[in-house]
Amino acid sequence: MTLDISKYPTLALANTPEELRLLPKETLPTLCDELRTYLLNSVSQSSGHLASGLGTVELTVALHYVYNTPVDKLIWDVGHQAYPHKILTGRRDQMPTIRQKDGLHPFPWREESEYDTLSVGHSSTSISAGLGLAISAQKEGKGRKVISVIGDGAITAGMAFEAMNHAGDVHPDMLVILNDNEMSISENVGALNNHLAKVLSGSLYTSIREGGKKVLSGVPPIKELVRRTEEHLKGMVVPGTLFEEFGFNYIGPIDGHDVNELVKTLKNMRELKGPQFLHIMTKKGKGYEPAEKDPIGYHGVPKFDPSHNCLPKSSGGKPTFSKIFGDFLCDMAAQDPKLMAITPAMREGSGMVRFSKEFPDQYFDVAIAEQHAVTLATGMAIAGDHPIVAIYSTFLQRGYDQLIHDIAIMDLPVMFAIDRAGLVGADGQTHQGAFDLSFMRCIPNMVIMAPSDENECRQMLYTGHKHTGPSAVRYPRGSGMGTEIEKEFTALEIGKGRVVRKGEKVAILSFGTFLPNALEAAKNLNATVADMRFVKPLDEALIRQLADEHDVLVTLEENAIAGGAGAGVIEFMMKEKIIKPVLNLGLPDKFIHQGTQEELHEELGLDAKGIEKSIAEYLAK
């Protein structure tokens, strides 16, 4: 449902940045108010990311007002905060389709708009990409500006600091904006600091600063004294010493919700040479009181009525796999004081809130630091503790070298609880958990499990926790099947699957939660169905038995076919000279766009009807 733009008269005049830049500066506060209201009313009707965007309204308006986008390059880190950017760059009327199949992408996306410089979704990439653009712009020599906007969470990642370290070395013209949306505005924010920002970013201060450096360049001790004096003077009122040490000129912190002050400061900083760093303080959820009070709860929202001042309560029902994991942690930690649970900033999403409160000394949130999370577990395992790394499939990609080098080579007992494995739905290409089986299966010493339901998940988590080497349990986003969960823990025999339906001619080897789809498809085909349970080691005896008793084998998984579980089945059969036709069903060799999980399963032929159809067509060849 498209919103009535006549209710937003100033916003109606700014459908593109070109139109925005024609508006009188005095109208910008009104524009921000209308943009914030429009965003709230739009996202509440479509669902999506809300609190982050509410906090970046003034910054977005100021950036597009001051800079000549898309000629000047604007990069948003992660992209949760970029909804106002989408609204102001010609996509306002499409906002009701965001995160939906064939609709607007949930994050900035190059194919969608010339204003989206970088396709994003994972954090902490903006400064590296911005630096590359800035170096190229400097060589181009046409005065093109580059701005990277990064949040206080994303900037904690090592990649961001690596980029800043390099930027200070090569010294190109670029601006990094730190959007610091902690819960309260810093005491440094206010008239004095806004005035200081204008002074420090102004041409007079810069001329004196640079001129003094040139005059004193031949006298190193005096030059160092001047540098330290300037640093200490600024340090009295600004917390930017760290960024200055990286070679950036630091300005701030300033109020990120004062659009006119932002415009003044950005205009000054636009003319400065070398790496610049602007620190702004914002409030996540700004302008909508429930989101201000609960920015985590309103980070991503379902459809809701803003006038109710609350989100709709979930209907309960079947537990999510994340909850199954969280309950396992609590139950297991009650028995095992050496259990240590690690998450890279995914406490809520991974189902670890209860555990973090009940076992705070065994809970470690390392922030957005996947590489560190994995090697932290290494140290704990060497010390004799029992670490579990809770991580999304898509983010485990960021700790791949550590998985190999720091865990698998030493055969350490670290378990990975891999959430969001398979298709996650609305977050699109950057978040689909399509590759974990492929990139883990080739690692020696790994044990990889794929549960078919909630109880299998619980018992596999126990199995992995008790295993004496590296292991992984991968499970999907969302609710389970309603299977009864056994409270007692039972370790599964490593590398053993089970036949759950006897048929003839065709055997479906199911890996993971597609098992109900396989069973439904098997009815009309009268096919055998096996729940393989283990991707590594494979149940080779069961594969051999199924190949002996059937004409065709079909593998089924929610992972890329390339290098996945099905590929492992074929590798074993070829090694053993078991010559039988094998049909691999799974995710195709392409990045999967957004849509609901059900829509994507149907589109890719991985629902029951699609599986049955694919097998029937294969048999007919």
UniProtKB/Swiss-Prot annotation:
Q: Give the function comment from the record.
A: Catalyzes the acyloin condensation reaction between C atoms 2 and 3 of pyruvate and glyceraldehyde 3-phosphate to yield 1-deoxy-D-xylulose-5-phosphate (DXP).
Reactions performed catalytically:
D-glyceraldehyde 3-phosphate + pyruvate + H(+) = 1-deoxy-D-xylulose 5-phosphate + CO2
Task: Give binding positions for thiamine diphosphate.
Answer: 80, 121-123, 153-154, 181, 288, 370
**Cofactor(s) annotated in UniProt:** Mg(2+); thiamine diphosphate
Q: Which NCBIfam families does this entry report, sorted A to Z?
A: dxs, PRK05444.2-2
The record's listing under InterPro entries reads: Dxylulose-5-P_synthase, THDP-binding, Transketo_C/PFOR_II, Transketolase-like_Pyr-bd, Transketolase_BS, Transketolase_C, Transketolase_CS
| Name this polypeptide is given | 1-deoxy-D-xylulose-5-phosphate synthase
Which leading EC class covers this enzyme? Answer: transferase
- Alphabetical keyword list: Isoprene biosynthesis, Magnesium, Metal-binding, Thiamine biosynthesis, Thiamine pyrophosphate, Transferase
Which biological pathway?
Answer: Metabolic intermediate biosynthesis; 1-deoxy-D-xylulose 5-phosphate biosynthesis; 1-deoxy-D-xylulose 5-phosphate from D-glyceraldehyde 3-phosphate and pyruvate: step 1/1
Enzyme Commission number(s): 2.2.1.7
